[in-house]
Amino acid sequence: MSELVYGIHTVESIVNQSPNRILIVYIVSNPRDLRLKSLIYRIRKMNINIQECTRRVLNIKSMKSAHQGIIAEVIPMPALNEDYLLHFLKTKNNIIPLLLVLDGITDPHNLGACIRSADAAGVHMIIVPRDRSANVNATVRKVASGSSDRVPFVRVTNLSRTLKLLKKYNIYIVGSVLRSNQILFNTRLIDPIALVMGSESSGIRRLTRENCDKLVHIPTLQSTVSLNVSVATGIFLFETVRQRKYQNGFINYS
């Protein structure tokens, strides 16, 4: 079984990280974009099968999504589950875990944007419930711009049970809500932590909330305005990065 991915950044990411997954690359005839030309040159040098197509054919293959003149047919990444998570928890000796839990993010664009932010923030793993999450499809991969191949993406059968497991391994659970007694910027985030983000329509579910150690919110100047979940995720993640990297009066990104 194979899947299609499209876009310069997305295909380039697979070329860089796992070219053995690529079965064939479809490219637009007579490309003009210099980035695309450079990528095609690299692909040819790697002896990967290439087929030139009209833009109309590429539009059909991508269902009229923005393919930027290149589509790759690839072997999907292996699915990760609770076994992968448990192995990570048992062998996390030399790192301070930063995990992202997405509860009910069903919009592919939001999921892709969350994955991209997670990659930029150095998240070690994304955890989603098996029955309440968008699949990592071509749209998610395009929005994630290659990040979906770098951040481990774990689907779990029971999210509440998974949060209990994280606590057993001393992972502190912080949930994002619209209103609470604690604001994000006054919350300690430098310890092993899992940040829990919910859907825009209903937030994190009741059982998920009950398994959080702390519920916090992002203060906004307009109380009637709520943030897009991917924007809120980015704010949560980079407040964590800020706290972890801030040393001796300056931010140390070394």
From Swiss-Prot:
Pfam families: SpoU_methylase (PF00588), SpoU_sub_bind (PF08032)
The UniProt record lists the keyword S-adenosyl-L-methionine: yes
GO-annotated cellular components: cytosol
InterPro entries linked to this entry: 23S_rRNA_MeTrfase_RlmB, Alpha/beta_knot_MTases, Ribosomal_eL30-like_sf, rRNA_MeTrfase_TrmH, SpoU_MeTrfase, SpoU_subst-bd, tRNA_m1G_MTases_N
Principal subcellular localisation of the protein: cytoplasm
Domain of life, source organism: Bacteria
Positions with a binding annotation for S-adenosyl-L-methionine: 198, 218, 227
Subcellular locations according to the entry: Cytoplasm
GO molecular function terms listed in the Swiss-Prot or TrEMBL record: RNA binding; rRNA (guanosine-2'-O-)-methyltransferase activity
Enzyme Commission number(s) from the entry: 2.1.1.185
Catalytic activity line of the entry: guanosine(2251) in 23S rRNA + S-adenosyl-L-methionine = 2'-O-methylguanosine(2251) in 23S rRNA + S-adenosyl-L-homocysteine + H(+)
Keywords: Cytoplasm, Methyltransferase, rRNA processing, S-adenosyl-L-methionine, Transferase
Subunit structure: Homodimer.
Function: Specifically methylates the ribose of guanosine 2251 in 23S rRNA.
Protein family: Belongs to the class IV-like SAM-binding methyltransferase superfamily. RNA methyltransferase TrmH family. RlmB subfamily.
Record's protein name: 23S rRNA (guanosine-2'-O-)-methyltransferase RlmB
Organism: Blochmanniella floridana
